[in-house]
Every structure is written in C-alpha cells, then in structure tokens.
Amino acid sequence: MECELLGEETGTFGQALESLKRGHLVTRKGWNGKGMFIFMRPEDCLSTEKVVNHVKSLPESFKKWIANNYGDSEIDKIKFTAYLCMKAADDTVVNGWLASQTDMLANDWVIVE
C-alpha cells in the first residue's frame, strides 16, 4: 500500500489518492498554480424523504423514480458512493473528475495547504 503525501513533498498519483481518502485537497505542480485542485466527496447515505424533497442536485425524474419505487420515508435510505471532484481554474466544481494518463503517471502531486 502506498503512503499518502506529506507536507510539501511531491509524490505519485497513488499517494495523492491516499491523501484524498484522508480528506486532503491535492493538486499537481504541473498545473502551474491555476487554482485547480482535486477533492473527494465522501460516500453518504440519505433518507428517501431527503432525496425526494430536499436534494437540489438531482433531476426531478430520478426523485420521482425514488418516490415511486422506495417511498418517501425517513427510514428507507439511498447510498451515494464517494467520487472525485475538481475545483477548476474558472472556479467551477467538476463532479466525477477522471484522471488522464498524464495525471496518473505524474510524480508532481502535492497537498494544497
């Protein structure tokens, strides 16, 4: 198992992933300080009531499907798995960020302080 990144040292994508799992923000020196970094959205388990009535980031068609197939209760739960996000140079957040081959093979990953 690869260790996470420490302090200001640079490391591999594997080390960056370990750091992400521990809640750190990571970036690449090769991204030239454009304010871009990666973070992990942790897994979550939400009641179907909350999903149907309160979550704004899901389409109404999915909420309707949940209501029709699970009901609208505090007891029934939907598990949302963890995924990576990127804070992009234009200050948007990209959900479901995927590393390129270049990113995966790079040795210039660092923790954002």
Question: At which residue positions do the language-model features occur?
Answer:
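Extended non-catalytic interaction/regulatory regions in multidomain proteins
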Residues: M1-A89
